[in-house]
Amino acid sequence: MKRTLFIGMLGLSALMSGYAQQGEGVRKGRIVREPLVHDPVMAKEGDTYYLYSTGHNVSSFSSKDLSEWTIRHSVFSAPPQWAVDSIKGYEGHTWAPDIIYYKGNYHLFYSCSAFGKNTSAIGHAYRRTLNPDSDEPWTDTGAVIVSHARDNFNAIDPNIVIDEEGNPWMTFGSFWGGIQLVRLTEDLTSTLKPEKLYTICTRQFEGASDV
């Protein structure tokens, strides 16, 4: 039976910039002992830990022992075209991913935004394995939720939770109206309609996974 472990990497959040912000200039396959990452999330599949973070097209690393990390290719080979077309100022620097194993697939949620604005979107992609050597690509399904300048919320920093009845929810947000909670569809590709947002923190706060 496949065992999967998800761990919130709050301790790594303090290690800003570094490899995650060097983008395509970082040599893939290089082994490092102290990867500097921003907004990390980690999952374990089999005997390997996989770390994803803010970076160009979502940075990724893998490790067998949580000590030595191999720099892997970015999740996407190019910025999602739907995000480039719909979010002015977005050029592929993708923020604050979240990972969840759900109904046979790994689901990746990621943030696309223009810095300092709430013209943003949270995207979704899925894959059956986290193994970067697999021939199976991430299948991107596009935007889960979008925020515009007229909205009092910011569609970034997603975190997925499953309630006691098995229903999927997403917390997200940063500044503006604070942290929001919204129900997702069973396939996790969009918000449940009619869409209803619940504000769970109204201060200028970010980090929905902390709530």
Regions found by a protein language model. Name each.
Residues 1-23:
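Bacterial Sec-dependent N-terminal signal peptides
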Residues 19-211:
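Carbohydrate-active catalytic/glycan-binding domains of CAZyme proteins
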